[in-house]
Amino acid sequence: MIESNESYSYGGDTIEPLGTLSGFDLVRRALEEARAAACAQGKDAGRGHVVPPVPFRVTDRRRNWSGPGPDVRDPQPLGKVAHDLAKKRGWSAQVAEGRVFGQWASMVGGQIADHAFPVGLNNGVLSVTAESTAWATQLRIMQAQLLAKIAAAVGNGVVTSLKITGPTAPSWRKGPWHIAGRGPRDTYG
């Protein structure tokens, strides 16, 4: 490169010194020098990737029907498409967890579903709330059978254990602030 502020000629072109160029002209000049260096080395100094046009053939206009046999272009059932999408995107675990809540009655039976409902599912532990302590006790006894029914419906590993609770007991706490009192008293005697 020339360090002076004089113009010089290179290959028939008059080249301005770098000190007089600024902004876009300086960038354009650097690009031209890089292209010239690439051409001097025998490389293709392209102006970006250009896809050659594909010649148009008359056969491209003909419609390709799927024919009498099954084809990937045939209409698919919505359930199959949704299942394939969930599997492809890695949503299978979340969909299985949602099925526990959505199909609770069909998984455990109508009688149990009338008296207990799922509340949450965290790390494979399904929290179930029963409408009475008697139903909570009965569900704790049936816990192994419930886990087997759930695993048969949504697959193994989705629900690993059950946390069964009864209805909440009445609370005497009032307001957002609480100071520890003297403990429970005999209020019913």
Swiss-Prot record:
* Region span, Disordered: 59-78
Superkingdom per UniProt: Bacteria
Q: Which family does it belong to?
A: Belongs to the UPF0232 family.
Q: What is this protein called?
A: UPF0232 protein ML0004
